Amino acid sequence: MDSRGVREGMGANGGCKGDLRAVECKTMAEGTGLRPIVVELRMPFLPEAGGNGVPGMLDPRMVDGHAYVEALTREVLASASDYADCQVRAVALTGGMAAHVADDALGALLRDVRQNFNLAPGAEIALRARPGMVAAASVDAFRIGHVSRIVMDYATSSLKEWRALGRVLDPGAMDVTRMVLGALSECGHGVRLAGREADLAFELLVGIPGQTPTSARESVEAAFAYGASEVRLGDCRPAANLAVPASATACTPSAEEAEQVRAAMQEALAAAGFAEYFPGCWALPGHESPYEVLVAAGTTETLGFGLGARTLFDGVEARNTSDLFTYLHFSDDPEKCVAAVHRVG
């Protein structure tokens, strides 16, 4: 079926993403049981002005976060009933920062996901946050939504490196965030939310201007001190990570220097009992991210919601509009919200 046929099929049967799934999806009636899926809720917010110039990212000071999350909720509710024969293995809020944008609406959204989808026992619910941008209302949303993994976009513990990144709040803001999140769990890492233990992951960057093996190890050790049960190592990309790339070019590490930095971080992680379960993802035993594992395996279908979100079932991909106005007003109308449908592979 060509992309036009898929889109017409979606509109003819109530206009839900579930109709795209129904084109080829094996169902319980065919004896396959519940089909495993992951759900991605796209939260494309960055606190830097203009989304730091990253295409598709939104500045929460310029865009009404509540209006966006409400549109996201409408899209979710419009599709949920079509996935009764599927089991959600993981829910991830992707694309940017989810915390401190519209916390009350976020908690309600995650509650709606739990109530309207069939979640597997122990299904992961993961979101991203920034140091200093987790309020008491954020923690309430985490509790309501049964968040089980908080990924801190920490980047570095070095003030010098932080300045090159142009972040809004310096790394010391993590001290406040750690207090807001509450005491460490009994095992010495992660947090406790309404009596449930949640993992605390830290994203660190490799190749920041001015970064050295010593400063990199200090960033890893800072993550340990804050209670990290997982650490993710990502590459610093000037277009996406640096506020003033031109002025930082002179002290940007060479490829060889960046590998030395990475090796120092990996050595520190291994010495602390962390193991690499996926390239760049290190975790203590038993604290690996189910979402990352499922996505890496490539065997689980993906249901995406939000601005520019991607849904993939049986080699048929649908992409939502990247136009904010269209999404805010027509998120529950696939004829207008879905921008493209095509086969992949």
Walk through the language-model features, giving the residues of each:
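Flexible, acidic/Gly-rich N-terminal and inter-domain linker regions that tether
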Residues: M1-E48, N52-G53, A99
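C-terminal scaffold of the Radical SAM
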Residues: L34-P36, M62-D82, C86-G345
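Detector for the c-type heme attachment site
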Residues: V54-D59
